[in-house]
Swiss-Prot record:
Key word Transmembrane present: yes
Cytoplasmic side: 1-10, 74-92, 148-159, 209-242, 297-313, 371-386, 439-457
Membrane side Extracellular: residue ranges: 32-52, 114-126, 181-187, 264-275, 335-349, 408-417
Residues of the signal peptide: none
A molecular-function term among this protein's GO annotations: xenobiotic transmembrane transporter activity
NCBIfam families linked: matE
Localisation: Cell inner membrane
A matching Pfam family: MatE
Protein name listed in UniProt: Multidrug resistance protein MdtK
Length: 457
């Protein structure tokens, strides 16, 4: 019991800064929306449309680079710290290549935006302008993620938290300058949010790089030999590990976007109620997602040390802590769901629907916690391909079709509307949780030599 208590303390010490960093990131998006809305409703809508395209594109790159964390954690655990700098250099090369692809996609996103049904031309132009300003921040964001993954792989999650809040503090005044045109800058409205956010990502990257350069604990792994050439072998391995994570993230983000599109014809009340419940459940998701990042670090580190039993302890402890958190947040959601809905909107019909959907959200929080922490465990074991197959099957083969059938058809029961899609979420997330646990159990039953051989690749 003592080993689990000790492991839980170490997991929480890693997870809490990640949670706070995510809060800062969410707050940046909130600030952009509010400040653009203060300029005009059209600018706020433009930022929202632009963000809906930016997120899938940049999260694909973000997911690809998540491969660095378990790689660095295992090198650190095995005492092969001299190899970390080379992995990080290749991470920067990979981030650079992916940045170019992301920038090309975002530059041409106008074709997608202008093809949207009945979109106002002025709104479309502002959304395109916002994305074309924001895309210059894509390299800064992805380079920052490489540096952050280096720190987190070395079990240092506080720097990412500090840089997150630094970014938030810089974002507010820079937004003000470019939205309203102060200090000789042009008045750009919502497009100014894109300029500000792009600048903030570069500030965060430079600040993180400065921290790494001066941190005594990383003195032995600093890059002292220049930037070096791309290493096709290392980059291929990072892509093999990272691509399934990137695709899983992409399919998860697009799933919720597709559901939002399917709900939109059902009416204003249904759309508003769905959006409130989804926004709140996304906030609750920060907790298990951050814990999953910590579990990846701990499992990877223990495997690097050559201890499959300690890796199992880290995995089980992460699941236990995650389930406890999910029970608490589920009780909180059920108890206060109407009060929470009232914080967003005071329309009685919207509040009633949002409260009903939040009840369903409370049901799936435990499954959601298990599946995301399970994903973190599998990342620690470098078993990322299974994450993609499980996520795709659970969300797109089971969750979305069943949600569609329940929400919009009479095949099983009378049409349930938005609640049907949320039942689909429950089916999809529960399926993912079960499959993740089965895969984890299968891996942990392998002989130690095979587990460690996979981890060392």
């Amino acid at each position: 019991m003592q080993k689990y208590t000790s492991e839980a303390r170490q997991l929480l010490a890693l997870a809490i800064p990640v949670i706070l960093a995510q809060v800062a990131q969410t707050a940046m998006g909130f600030v952009d929306t509010v400040m653009a809305g203060g300029y005009s409703a059209t600018d706020m809508a433009a930022v929202a449309i632009g963000t809906s395209i930016w997120l899938p594109a940049i999260l694909f790159g973000h997911g690809l680079l998540l491969a660095l964390t378990p790689v660095i954690a295992q090198l650190n655990g095995s005492g092969r710290r001299e190899r970390i700098a080379h992995q990080v250099r290749q991470g920067f090369w990979l981030a650079g290549f992916v940045s170019v692809l992301v920038m090309i996609v975002l530059w041409n996103a106008g074709y997608i935006i202008r093809s949207m049904h009945n979109i106002d031309p002025a709104l479309a132009d502002k959304a395109v302008g916002y994305l074309r300003a924001l895309l210059w921040g894509a390299p800064g964001y992805l380079f920052f993620q490489v540096a952050r993954n280096q720190c987190e792989g070395l079990a240092k999650t506080k720097p990412g938290m500090v840089m997150g809040f630094l970014g938030l503090l810089v974002n507010i005044p820079v937004n003000y300058i470019f939205i309203y045109g102060h200090f000789g800058m042009p008045e750009l409205g919502g497009i100014g949010c894109g300029v500000a956010t792009a600048a903030v990502y570069w500030v965060m990257f430079i600040a993180m790089l400065s921290y790494i350069k001066h941190a005594r604990s990383m003195r032995d792994i600093r890059n002292e030999k220049g930037f070096g050439k791309p290493d096709s072998v290392v980059m291929k391995r990072l892509i093999q590990l990272g691509l399934p994570i990137a695709l899983a993230l992409f399919f998860e983000v697009t799933l919720f976007a597709v559901v939002a599109l399917l709900v939109s014809p059902l009416g204003i009340v249904d759309v508003a109620g769905h959006q409130i419940a989804l926004n709140f459940s996304s906030l609750m998701f920060v907790l298990p997602m951050s814990l999953a990042a910590a579990v990846t670090i701990r499992v990877g580190y223990r495997l690097g040390q050559g201890s499959t039993l300690d890796a199992q302890t880290a995995a089980r402890t992460g699941l236990g802590v995650g389930i406890c958190m999910a029970v608490v947040t589920a009780i909180f959601t059920v108890t206060l769901r109407k009060h929470i809905a009232l914080l967003y909107n005071d329309n009685p019909e919207v509040v009633a629907l949002a409260a009903q959907l939040m009840l369903l959200a409370a049901v799936y929080q435990i499954s959601d916690s298990i599946q995301v922490i399970g994903s973190g465990i599998l990342r620690g074991y470098k078993d990322t391909r299974s994450i993609f197959f499980i996520t795709f099957t659970a969300y797109w083969v089971l969750g979305l079709p069943s949600g569609y059938i329940l929400a919009l058809t009479d095949l099983v029961v009378d049409r349930m509307g938005p609640a049907g899609f949320w039942m689909g979420f429950i089916i999809g997330l529960t399926s993912a949780a079960v499959l993740m646990m089965l895969r984890m159990r299968y891996l942990q039953r392998q002989p130690s030599a095979i587990i460690l051989q996979r981890a060392a690749r």
